[in-house]
Amino acid sequence: MSLSPVVVIGTGLAGLAAANELVNKYNIPVTILEKASSIGGNSIKASSGINGACTETQRHFHIEDSPRLFEDDTIKSAKGKGVQELMAKLANDSPLAIEWLKNEFDLKLDLLAQLGGHSVARTHRSSGKLPPGFEIVSALSNNLKKLAETKPELVKINLDSKVVDIHEKDGSISAVVYEDKNGEKHMVSANDVVFCSGGFGFSKEMLKEYAPELVNLPTTNGQQTTGDGQRLLQKLGADLIDMDQIQVHPTGFIDPNDRSSSWKFLAAESLRGLGGILLNPITGRRFVNELTTRDVVTAAIQKVCPQEDNRALLVMGEKMYTDLKNNLDFYMFKKLVQKLTLSQVVSEYNLPITVAQLCEELQTYSSFTTKADPLGRTVILNEFGSDVTPETVVFIGEVTPVVHFTMGGARINVKAQVIGKNDERLLKGLYAAGEVSGGVHGANRLGGSSLLECVVFGRTAAESIANDRK
């Protein structure tokens, strides 16, 4: 049995999951190539959590869920796009993914939120100070860093290493070529390669090609997210699927000190899932079910809010501070969120309604815990209370739609093998996981499913490699 190192391209959660599973479970050595100067990709910034259906945490909170219900929610969100068998695998493997993170890396994942498009609360995060993406990525990367020091024959991590070519021979992977920060090229022999190189949300060139209407929108993506993996896989003959399906997240924070910046901090969906509402600056009123799917919330902001900057107001009650203290403290430190009384809100944001009318708007929303919301929101948490006054304190920030996630990419099968245009496995030893792949989310990704996709298909790639090597 060959034990040549598996080359893992990228150190977001998909790459970290694949690498950890390869070395910890199968004792297969890995060489990890990361084009950036640090580990984590976009995964390290994930702020809402990771989905799982039928988990121990859900049982603790008496939440009834099933992989089938999760799959149905995913299919509904996908709007006829994508590959249903990949969606089924995502849902069916979700409790195993949560269990793996808890058991292997001692993560608590003991809190839940219900995000847009989900039938129940299934997005997991841990109590404590760390955001979910940072916590999960840190745990997995720390394990690999330790192994790189203590067992260098098992784990090698190369940063500032951009993959520029893949060599094949007789229908199999044979080598990977990468370029270091000095521009020098190096070749690594490899029988197996796992592409975990992320999406293309930072690439104006690729956005112009696949979704030109989005080129001028700001993005939450890191500057490494330029679609290198998709281009290399396309060159090898991979079937690219749903490349025009690009998720615009409805809420990226507008920095009042740099309003026109093309990069935005994400205003996590959990801010709405745990109680935040959206107000239209033109009317001072709610205008959308904040927990419908991301594409619908985005369309509503773009349709009714100020056209010049697509701006909405994210308003959160004081009760939310208990659940999201660390998030809100960070956002306030960055001047993205303010803590104001309602009197101050009307003045500060020049709302066209009186303070009394704003109080009435928030109190009416709070009453939907006992009656139906005309806008259709069914999860009313951490509302503003039954006695809203001009001195009621809220947390508020300005938000705008942002390019966030590319659903399209190289088509894979349920074994995480890259598929060619003839519907067959493209090359022996070629795998993909995470945002570089396509078909898992269709036209719209559910919040909490990106981290899940990384764990499910990263681990699957490792399992497939191990099975091929038997």
Curated annotation (Swiss-Prot):
A Pfam family assignment: FAD_binding_2
Q: What else is known?
A: Present with 7620 molecules/cell in log phase SD medium.
Family, per entry: Belongs to the FAD-dependent oxidoreductase 2 family. FRD/SDH subfamily.
> What is known about its induction?
During anaerobic growth.
Q: Where can this protein be found?
A: Cytoplasm
What name does this protein carry? Fumarate reductase 1
One GO BP annotation is: cellular response to anoxia
Function, as annotated:
Irreversibly catalyzes the reduction of fumarate to succinate. Together with the second isozyme of soluble fumarate reductase (OSM1), essential for anaerobic growth. Involved in maintaining redox balance. Reduction of fumarate is the main source of succinate during fermentation, and under anaerobic conditions, the formation of succinate is strictly required for the reoxidation of FADH(2).
> Which residues are the active-site ones?
H249, R272
What catalytic activity is recorded? succinate + NAD(+) = fumarate + NADH + H(+)
Keyword Cytoplasm in annotation: yes
The cross-references to InterPro entries, in alphabetical order and at most eight, read: FAD-dep_OxRdtase_2_FAD-bd, FAD-oxidoreductase_2, FAD/NAD-bd_sf, Flavocytochrome_c, Succ_DH/fumarate_Rdtase_cat_sf
Q: Where does FAD bind?
A: 6-20
EC numbers, comma separated = 1.3.1.6
First-listed, main subcellular location of the protein, grouped into a coarse class: cytoplasm
Cofactor binding note: Binds 1 FAD per monomer.
The cofactors it requires, by name, are: FAD
Listed GO MF terms: FMN binding; fumarate reductase (NADH) activity
PTM per UniProt?
The N-terminus is blocked.
Using the record's annotations, give every residue carrying the modification Phosphoserine. Answer: S66
Q: Which domain of life is it from?
A: Eukaryota
Q: Quick one: a GO cellular component term?
A: plasma membrane
- Which EC class, in a word? oxidoreductase
Keywords recorded for this protein, A-Z = Cytoplasm, FAD, Flavoprotein, NAD, Oxidoreductase, Phosphoprotein
